[in-house]
Curated annotation (Swiss-Prot):
Name of the protein described by the UniProt record: Nitrate reductase [NADH]
Species this protein is from: Solanum lycopersicum
Biased composition annotated in UniProt, kind: Acidic residues: 61-71
Molecular function GO labels: FAD binding; heme binding; molybdenum ion binding; molybdopterin cofactor binding; nitrate reductase (NADH) activity; nitrate reductase (NADPH) activity
Domain FAD-binding FR-type: 654-766
Lineage of producing organism: Eukaryota, Viridiplantae, Streptophyta, Embryophyta, Tracheophyta
Positions contributing to heme binding: 571, 594
Subunit structure: Homodimer.
Residue ranges, annotated region (Disordered): 1-71
Length: 911
C-alpha cells in the first residue's frame, strides 16, 4: 500500500469570456477538473465591453505550456460534466414560498423543509464530478428568501473609514478593476453536523458530509476596492471590514445578513479575497449570490456574504445579529440558555474564521455491498475520499485505519491545484488507498484522519458544541457481513449518518438502541411531548384547516395545536416556512429542523389538542405518543361524534388521500396505464380541468412527490387513470438513475396504496373557451396547444373536456413533440379525435429522429415555420397552451410564439 503525493498544476489561461482574462489552466493528465469555461448558451453575460487585463494568480513554478489540443480536451471534460446533469426546474416544493421563481436541481437534499432553501448534493454525485462541482449541485445555505436582483440596478457601496466613499455599479466592478479567477473550496461550518445531533441535538439542522463544494470564482480583489476608496489607517480606527447583504431576515427582530473580518485580512494580498461576480464561467446563480458576493478563500462559508450591498470599514466588528448568533464554537458545557444568559455569543475567542482540518470517506458509499467471492478477493478494493484544511494550508497526509487506530496506512494524495505565489492551497484534495478485501472482511470499521502542513490533525472523538459546528472527528464507516444473494456473503458499509431527515447510518442505529435501553415502559410527562391534559381545549382537523393564513396560522405537531400567528415576524426561518404549513400537520418537518430549545419555545404557543384516536401524522406514520395510551379510550366517544360523512369529492386541499392500485396495463415497453381506486366508490376525484395532482411515495427512505395529470375524465366515479412513461435506469445518459417515481409506479403490485395530494396548478378550464388563470378570466375560440413528451397529458385533459361538451365549439390545434414515434403518448386517441372532428381538432407531430419509413410529419425540433403552418395566428380570441420540458418552453416555444406576434405574457398559458 505505497503512498505518494501528486501536485496537479494550473497555469495562466488565455483571455476567456468577453475579453476577461482567465487565470489558470489544468494539466491534461489531471482526472479531476479545472477551469477555462466556454460561454454558456443560457447564461448570457450582461457585460460585453473591453475590460482591464486580469491580475493573474502568481505561482511558484514556471508556466506549463500546454497546447490547444490539451485545453480543448479539458473543455470537453467540463461539457461532459454538464451533460450528466438533469436540468434545473421550478421545484414543486418551492410552490407557495418566496423562492418559487428559482430553478433548482431536484436531486439536492433539502435539510430545512420547504423554506428557506438549505441543501447539499448526494455525496456520491458530488464526488462523481471530482475537483470542480457543477453549480446546480453546489451546496446552498440560505437564511431566508433569495432577493430578486437586477444587474443593471445593483450597486455596492464602500463607506465608513475611507477617504472617498463610493458606490460601484456592476459594470464598473467588471470594467474598471482588474479581476482574479481561481478555484476555491467553500465549506459550511456545519458540515457533518448531523453526527453531533446524533449525540445531542444542537440548535442547527442536519448537514451531512456534502456541505462542501469547489467552483471557479472570478471577481475584483477586495483590497483594490478599498484602495480606490482610500481606506484609512489603523491609527485612525480602521480595524475591521464589514460586509452586508440585501436579504432582510427575521433574526434579532429584523436585520440583514452581515459579518466582518479584520482589516489586516482584507488588505493581505496573500489571502486572495475577492468581490465575486462569476462562478464556473457564468454569472452567479440566485442561490449563490447574484449578482455579487464575497469569496474569502480558506474561511468558512458564513463569512462570504451573498447579495453584497455594502462594505463598511469600521473600528468595531459587524453589529449584525448573524455575526454574533451564528458561526461560533462554544465550549461543550455551554447550551443555548447559558450562552444567552452569560453572553457567550459575544466573546471574540469563540468566533470561527478559518476552516479546520477535515476528511471524509466517500468510497465505499453508504449501504454499498461488496460481494466476497473468488473474483473480488483476487484484487484490492480502493477506498476514496476528500480532505481539506483552512487558511491556505496544504493537506500533507491522510491515513486510514482498519483496527481502531492501532495501525495506520498512508494514502495517496491528489492535489489538483498548484500553490499560489504565497504557497497557499485554497481547494480540497482527494485521497485513495488500496486495501485487501480479506482485510476488510476481518475488520469492523474504516476510519480516516488528515493532517495539514502545520501538523494539525483530526481528533479521534467528536467534541459537541451547541451550534454543531466544525465537526472534524475521525470519519468512520462501519462494516457488517451480509448475504446479498443466496449462497453468497458480502460486506455492507454504513456511514455514520444520512443528511437532513433521511434515515440510516450507524449512529442513528446506536442512538435508537440507547433510547430503547433506557425507555420507561409507561408514558412520562415532558415538555417536548407533554401528557395530554383532558381539560385542554379540543379542536377537530376541519377547524384547524381554517386557520391557514397570516391572520391566523395554526399548526399541528405531535397531535398538539399551536397558534403561530404572533410568532410569524420573529421566526428565524421567515414567514413563508410557517404559512406554507399553516392549517396542517407539520410534525415531520418540525422535528427534522428544530432543536430541543425550539420545541420548548413552541409550548408558549400551544392552544389545544387535536380530536383523534391513535393519532398519526399526515407525513410521519406512527410518530405520536398517543397511539397506545389511555387517552385513546378517553377520546374514542368524542371521535364518533365528530366524524364527517363520506365526501363526494376525494381530493382534500393540503391533505393526502390514500388510493389503491386496482389495474395496470402495459401499453408499450415503457408506457403504462394505471388505474387507482378512490377512498370511496361514490366519489369523484375532484380535480378541475387544467389542474394536476401530486403522487407521494417513500422511495429509498425519502419522500418523493411528482406531478401528474389524469387521463380519465373529471366525472369518473370511484377511480382515476394515469398514462405514465417509465424512465428506466441506465437508458438515458443524462438521467442514469432513471425516473424515481415512474420506476416506483412500475414496481407497485396490484393492491398497493399511493398517497395523492391536490388539486394544484394555476390554470383551470371552465368550459366553452373560458379559463381561470391565477384568478383572472381569459377566453379563446381557438387554442394553439403545444406539448412535449409527457406534457401532452394536461393538453389531453382540456381537449377531452371540450369534446365531451356538445355546446363547446372551441377549436384546437395541437403540435406535439417527442424524441421518436415510439415516445408519442395517447396517439390513437389524438388521431381518433382529429378524424372524428377534423374541423375542430388538428394534430401535428414533431420527432427528433424518425425510425419509420414514410413518416409524414415533421422531423427535428419545434420551429417558427412549423408553428406558423400548424397553429392559428395570434388574435384577441386565441390562446396558446404549452406543457413540456423547461428548455423546450424557453428555447422553442417562447421565442417562436413571439416571432409570430403572440404576447406570451398574456396569451401563453404554461401548465
Amino acid at each position: 500500500m505505497a503512498a505518494s503525493v501528486e501536485n496537479r498544476q494550473y497555469t495562466h489561461l488565455e483571455p476567456g469570456l468577453s475579453g476577461v482574462g482567465r487565470t489558470f489552466k489544468p494539466r491534461p493528465d489531471s482526472p479531476v477538473r479545472g477551469c477555462n469555461f466556454p460561454p454558456s448558451s443560457n447564461h448570457e453575460l450582461p457585460f460585453q465591453k473591453k475590460q482591464n487585463p486580469p491580475i493573474y494568480l502568481d505561482y511558484s513554478s514556471s508556466e506549463d505550456e500546454d497546447d490547444d489540443d490539451e485545453k480543448n480536451e479539458y473543455v470537453q471534460m467540463i461539457k461532459k460534466g454538464k451533460t450528466e446533469l438533469e436540468p434545473s426546474i421550478h421545484d414543486t416544493r418551492d410552490e407557495g414560498t418566496a423562492d418559487n421563481w428559482i430553478e433548482r436541481n431536484f436531486s439536492l437534499i433539502r435539510l430545512t423543509g420547504k423554506h428557506p432553501f438549505n441543501s447539499e448534493p448526494p455525496l456520491s454525485r458530488l464526488m462523481h464530478h471530482g475537483f470542480i462541482t457543477p453549480v446546480p449541485l453546489h451546496y446552498v445555505r440560505n437564511h431566508g428568501p433569495v432577493p430578486k436582483a437586477s444587474w443593471s440596478d445593483w450597486t455596492v457601496e464602500v463607506t465608513g473609514l475611507v477617504k472617498r466613499p463610493m458606490k460601484f455599479t456592476m459594470d464598473q466592478l467588471v470594467n474598471e478593476f482588474p479581476s482574479r479567477e481561481f478555484p476555491v473550496t467553500l465549506v459550511c461550518a456545519g458540515n457533518r453536523r448531523k453526527e453531533q445531533n446524533m449525540v445531542k441535538q444542537t440548535i442547527g439542522f442536519n448537514w451531512g458530509a456534502a456541505a462542501v463544494s469547489t467552483t471557479v470564482w472570478r471577481g475584483v480583489p477586495l483590497r483594490a476596492l478599498l484602495k480606490r476608496c482610500g481606506v484609512q489607517s489603523k491609527k485612525k480606527g480602521a480595524l475591521n471590514v464589514c460586509f452586508e447583504g440585501s436579504d432582510v431576515l427575521p433574526g434579532g427582530g429584523g436585520s440583514k445578513y452581515g459579518t466582518s473580518i479584520k482589516k489586516e485580512f482584507a488588505m493581505d494580498p496573500s489571502r486572495d479575497i475577492i468581490v465575486a461576480y462569476m462562478q464556473n464561467g457564468e454569472m452567479l446563480s440566485p442561490d449563490h449570490g447574484f449578482p455579487v458576493r464575497m469569496i474569502i478563500p480558506g474561511f468558512i462559508g458564513g463569512r462570504m456574504v451573498k447579495w453584497l450591498k455594502r462594505i463598511v470599514v469600521t473600528t468595531q466588528e459587524s453589529e449584525s445579529y448573524y455575526h454574533y448568533k451564528d458561526n461560533r464554537v462554544l465550549p461543550p458545557h455551554v447550551d443555548a440558555e447559558l450562552a444567552n444568559a452569560e453572553a457567550w455569543w459575544y466573546k471574540p475567542e469563540y468566533i470561527i474564521n478559518e476552516l479546520n482540518i477535515n476528511s471524509v470517506i466517500t468510497t465505499p458509499c453508504h449501504e454499498e455491498i461488496l460481494p466476497i467471492n473468488a473474483w473480488t478477493t483476487q484484487r484490492p478494493y480502493t477506498l476514496r475520499g476528500y480532505a481539506y484544511s483552512g487558511g491556505g494550508k496544504k493537506v500533507t497526509r491522510v491515513e486510514v485505519t482498519l483496527d481502531g487506530g492501532e495501525t495506520w496506512s498512508v494514502c495517496t494524495l491528489d492535489h489538483p491545484e498548484k500553490p499560489t505565489k504565497y504557497g497557499k492551497y485554497w481547494c480540497w484534495c482527494f485521497w485513495s488507498l488500496e486495501v485487501e478485501v480479506l482485510d476488510l472482511l476481518s475488520a469492523k470499521e474504516i476510519a480516516v484522519r488528515a493532517t495539514d502542513e502545520t501538523l494539525n490533525t483530526q481528533p479521534e472523538k467528536l467534541i459537541w458544541n451547541v451550534m454543531g459546528m466544525m465537526n472534524n472527528c475521525w470519519f468512520r464507516v462501519k462494516m457488517n457481513v451480509c448475504k446479498p444473494h443466496k449462497g453468497e456473503i458480502g460486506i455492507v458499509f454504513e456511514h455514520p449518518t444520512q443528511p437532513g431527515n433521511q434515515s440510516g447510518g450507524w449512529m442513528a442505529k446506536e442512538r435508537h438502541l440507547e433510547i430503547s435501553a433506557v425507555a420507561p415502559p409507561t408514558l412520562k410527562k415532558s415538555i417536548s411531548t407533554p401528557f395530554m391534559n383532558t381539560a385542554s381545549k379540543m379542536y377537530s382537523m376541519s377547524e384547524v384547516r381554517k386557520h391557514n393564513s397570516s391572520d391566523s396560522a395554526w399548526i399541528i405537531v405531535h397531535g398538539h395545536i399551536y397558534d403561530a400567528s404572533r410568532f410569524l415576524k420573529d421566526h428565524p426561518g421567515g414567514v413563508d416556512s410557517i404559512l406554507i404549513n399553516a392549517g396542517t400537520d407539520c410534525t415531520e418537518e418540525f422535528d427534522a429542523i428544530h432543536s430541543d430549545k425550539a420545541k420548548k419555545l413552541l409550548e408558549d404557543f400551544r392552544i389545544g389538542e387535536l380530536i383523534t384516536t391513535g393519532y398519526t401524522s399526515d407525513s410521519s406514520p406512527n410518530s405520536s405518543v398517543h397511539g397506545s395510551s389511555s387517552i385513546s379510550s378517553f377520546l374514542a366517544p368524542i371521535k364518533e361524534l365528530v366524524q364527517t360523512p363520506t365526501r363526494s369529492v376525494a381530493l382534500i386541499p393540503r391533505e393526502k388521500i390514500p388510493c389503491k392500485l386496482v389495474d395496470k396495463q402495459s401499453i408499450s415497453h415503457d408506457v403504462r396505464k394505471f388505474k387507482f381506486a378512490l377512498p370511496s366508490e361514490d366519489q369523484v376525484l375532484g380535480l378541475p380541468v387544467g389542474k394536476h395532482i401530486f403522487l407521494c411515495a417513500t422511495v429509498d427512505d425519502k419522500l418523493c412527490m411528482r406531478a401528474y395529470t389524469p387521463t380519465s375524465t373529471v366525472d369518473e366515479v370511484g377511480f382515476f387513470e394515469l398514462v405514465v412513461k417509465i424512465y428506466f435506469k441506465g437508458v438515458h445518459p443524462k438521467f442514469p438513475n432513471g425516473g424515481q417515481m415512474s420506476q416506483h409506479l412500475d414496481s407497485l403490485p396490484i393492491g398497493a396504496f399511493l398517497d395523492v395530494k391536490g388539486p394544484l396548478g394555476h390554470i383551470e378550464y371552465q368550459g366553452k373557451g373560458n379559463f381561470l388563470v391565477h384568478g383572472k378570466q381569459k377566453f379563446a375560440k381557438k387554442l394553439a396547444m403545444i406539448a412535449g413528451g409527457t406534457g401532452i397529458t394536461p393538453v389531453y385533459q382540456v381537449m377531452q373536456s371540450i369534446l365531451k361538451d356538445p355546446e363547446d365549439d372551441t377549436e384546437m390545434y395541437v403540435v406535439y413533440a417527442n424524441r421518436t414515434e415510439d415516445d408519442i403518448l395517447l396517439k390513437d386517441e389524438l388521431d381518433a379525435w382529429a378524424e372524428q372532428v377534423p374541423n375542430r381538432v388538428k394534430v401535428w407531430y414533431v420527432v427528433q429522429e424518425s425510425i419509420t419509413q414514410g413518416w409524414k410529419y415533421s422531423t427535428g425540433f419545434v420551429t417558427e415555420s412549423i408553428l406558423r403552418e400548424h397553429i392559428p395566428e395570434p388574435s384577441h380570441t386565441t390562446l396558446a397552451l404549452a406543457c413540456g420540458p423547461p428548455p423546450m418552453i424557453q428555447f422553442a416555444i417562447n421565442p417562436n410564439l413571439e416571432k409570430m406576434g403572440y404576447d406570451i405574457k398574456e396569451e401563453l398559458l404554461v401548465f
